[in-house]
């Protein structure tokens, strides 16, 4: 949880996340308004000591707390998807290409394990291995989801969710997958890298 907050804080400070956000004017007070330019959920100033005081949410003595779980937040995200011919007809220059995708189901009892078989299926489908993909966005429903994926897949923390994730940015229902895709697209554009993998639970795309 701490790393996610720190990474989101850095992404905000450098303007990386701002480049993905369309500012909107929202009501404030009885007659006023304000321009929202940044996500409100990140807490980059939080400390490990503060996180350690948070109580388990599912069972006594458990390890899942509000500090290592995603926040259910309001949000919206938008991308335009089309084939090359349609984009060319409209004079739209694509910024990324969906190479492939997989959908893999797991038992609801282990729903947090979904990214692992889904990513493996994608690797197998494309004849790829972990190191062939430059960057991974894996939804931080809970921190343990990412820890499990890193361990089982052998992918480094330095190539996964480096701008924060669901724990720090939030997990708006219906928008998270697109938000992650936009972040991955910006990462590829700014880094000059080629492939990113987005894993939202059991559906992955490259």
Q: Model-flagged regions — what are they?
A:
Residues 46-113, 117, 124-125, 182-183, ...:
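Condensing-enzyme catalytic core mediating Claisen C-C bond formation in acyl metabolism
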Residues 1-89, 152, 157-159:
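N-terminal extracellular/periplasmic Venus flytrap/periplasmic-binding protein-like
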Residues 3, 7-10, 50-53, 118-121, ...:
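Alpha-helical scaffold segments in soluble metabolic enzymes
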Residues 1-5, 17, 43-47, 69-73, ...:
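Generic structural signal for well-ordered, non-membrane alpha-helical segments
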Residues 130, 151-152, 156-161, 166-205:
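Internal helix-turn-beta structural module
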Residues 34-65, 104-106, 135-142, 167-179, ...:
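Hydrophobic transmembrane alpha-helix bundles
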Residues 28, 99-168:
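Active-site pocket-lining segment
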């Amino acid at each position: 949880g701490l790393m996610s907050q720190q990474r989101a804080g850095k992404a905000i400070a450098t303007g990386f996340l701002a480049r993905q956000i369309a500012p909107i004017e929202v009501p404030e007070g009885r007659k006023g308004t304000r321009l929202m330019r940044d996500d409100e959920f990140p807490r980059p100033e939080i400390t490990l000591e503060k996180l350690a005081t948070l109580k388990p949410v599912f069972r006594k003595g458990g390890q899942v707390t509000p500090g290592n779980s995603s926040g259910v937040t309001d949000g919206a995200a938008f991308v335009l998807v089309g084939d090359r011919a349609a984009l060319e007809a409209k004079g739209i220059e694509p910024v990324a290409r969906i190479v492939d995708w997989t959908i893999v189901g797991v038992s609801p009892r282990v729903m947090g394990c979904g990214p692992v078989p889904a990513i493996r299926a994608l690797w197998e489908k494309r004849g790829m291995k972990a190191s062939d993909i430059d960057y991974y966005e894996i939804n931080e429903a809970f921190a343990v989801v990412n820890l499990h994926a890193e361990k089982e897949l052998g992918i480094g923390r330095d190539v996964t969710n480096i701008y924060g994730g669901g724990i720090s940015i939030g997990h708006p229902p219906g928008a998270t997958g697109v938000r992650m895709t936009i972040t991955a697209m910006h990462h590829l554009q700014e880094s000059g890298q080629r492939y990113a993998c987005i894993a939202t639970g059991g559906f992955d795309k490259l």
